[in-house]
Structure formats: C-alpha cells, structure tokens
C-alpha cells in the first residue's frame, strides 16, 4: 500500500481537506506552473531538495517503500502528495496556520518571519 495514498485517504476520512491551502500556496509560489524554478525550489509548490529528502525519511520511518525523486517536484500530483506527507508528520493536528507557516519557513520556522506569507495565503483562501 502506498503511504501517501493512505495519508490522503485518512485526511479525507477525517473530513480535512488540504486542497484549498495547497491551491492558495500554488497561486503564490508558481501561479500553477509545474515547471516553475526559483533556485533550488521547483514545481507548483516550489519544493526544495531538502523537503524531498524529509518526505523520503518520513516514508522510510513508516515502513513504506515509496520514495520521491527530485524530478517528482515537477509533477503537481506528486508535489501535493509531498505536502500532505509533510503536514501529516509535522502538523498532525491539521492547523492551517501552522501548515502555511511551515511551508514558508521550513520545519523550524520563525513565526514572526512567516506572518506576511501567512496573510497572503489566507487572503487567497477567503
């Protein structure tokens, strides 16, 4: 069984839908362009190599054989799967605010440094 699919199924079963958050972030990060590149950040969600490695570490620790490649960042569906994996592990209570700040500032984000990004994403969601 694929871990990412299990996570997505679990999120839907719990009634939580990351789609509005992901769609707002996608508009800010890449305007929906799966080929968008900004330094080491690429794809619709502007995923870094560090984030791919973190997803693979989470998958490995869960016993899954699934792994993501750097090229997967250019695939919108796989990018969204990686978003869900990161949130399921680092944001298990599904806090939208934490999800946005985590995406902007990384796993050890600074709250004050992520507030402008948080406001941008929240405006797009409303």
PLM regions: where:
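Catalytic glycan-binding domains that act on GlcNAc-containing polysaccharides
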Residues: 6-126
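Sec-dependent N-terminal signal peptides
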Residues: 1-5
